[in-house]
């Protein structure tokens, strides 16, 4: 076996576009390429790729990486305008950070190069930039439950094209996907010296750097900063005139706003500040401090009837209530040339919006908050070229920005992406979805149908059906929340099944018309008759038998031959994580658990384990669309079976395989390509590799700049059955990434 590494020289010369990422001291390239409005943006990497023959003659191959075009799909926790025309930044809770590229009129990820080991750094807790040098970008990154809770400050001086890293784990705790993640910002730069940086932690209090973030020391605020809601210090702002620092602590019924006039060496509680609400955000305007309040830290637990907006005048030491209503608010922005003109948004309110969905309210004032106009009954909403959003609302509005160069323009975050309005002061403001380039879904499964579309299931928003990776599709019309599994009958490809749901919603659906209509099965397979939900599904090759291993069914497999009118429990097969049906013979079904590989030869009535195969972690059994009995399985390396799983042969060339997928081959001599997330023998780096000769030789198709945090929650790698050289991979919060081979 011959393995050829990526040539650093070729990469430097031939990488046409760069990806910005968050690894320490690495040069990355921007996720940027010319693209039509309805397609995803790609970035490129050049590799020496083995041709697959025994002579190991290589050919130069260009791989282009992008994200499958869904559009938004997750909570964007902060959005920011800069003084540079057309330059915006955004942060997300699980999908990294983005920069708006005005030349492409879309968002560009700056987080492609996060490794699987460091995938927690895709949770961005806070974002800051130097006011007069917006190329200097700072990201506070970390996720409590990933990467051993690693907390880091990621520092860039080139708009996020490259980053250096300062680890903060021993000083403070960061959790980009924690409650209160829409609060902010927890980073503040001294307006007169951007090398002086203050950061507030969920635990650990406040820390300060005087060398641009290279080193930090802890500050004593004279009060306990750890809070019952684990949100800690949630906002820091600095008065550019006086240099005074204000910090908010996420608590109520006690002092929660503190001030320092000596660079953080000493702190005092601000007298007269409201104590019965929690501070969400703070910002300076015209020498006064605007403070936004809600009953809890958010984004979804506020009681919706308590909150407001206060103006603090430090000269008079007075607070003035300018709330549009007694409701929880997320943010307020001020016209840069007229401090009397402001826009405010609620957070976690659910009232009618123009498209019929329920979400937050928007208000404007032109008299400094003496009176406010509600916009919900006069504004309009449009999809911005991403059609699935038409049935969704603008909600969880915890951050807004106003363009200092074009103050008619605002952007606001939502639980599903970013919305924008370019005429906010008009009588009929026009809001539109502004999320092209942002891909923040959490994918759980994807199926490439031969001569058909891509179908997927994701967290929160059901899933998508789309003609290809670069065209925005529509969500399944069942719109049933989080889905965990989907399968297609390979010989009857109009029949699909999927599962999701929860304790209150039946969790199995099927379609017999390729997703045009879905039927929700009401009958539970569980003996207790409790609602079954989530788990794994499969459908026989002929589409006549459905299989389901519900998450709350102890991993037992159930099958139905009457479309869910009745269910029968299979014998054998326990703690099941994945099910696959043979693509040709409807009698054969395969299942896996963390301890066993199971096969059935009687249509799922009984399953027996393969006692010869050691399985420690359950992965998907992968089948080809037209070959009976052939199974690819990631276990103790890469295993292949040609007899329905009775026996497996280990591929000697692979030392580690965490996920495996199959895709369309180049020609009849190589009908299928194998893709893995793993390590062939002789390779040191975990990554995406492919083989065109059934595993005899392998070549890496990604590099350190294209890691995407690894396969994430979905844990899948799949090839496309219609496009040669296209591979898909799930992520923890960057949607589904894909790579295309270009000769």
Language-model segments: which ranges?
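Extracellular glycan-interacting surfaces
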Residues: 2-5, 9, 20-34, 47-743
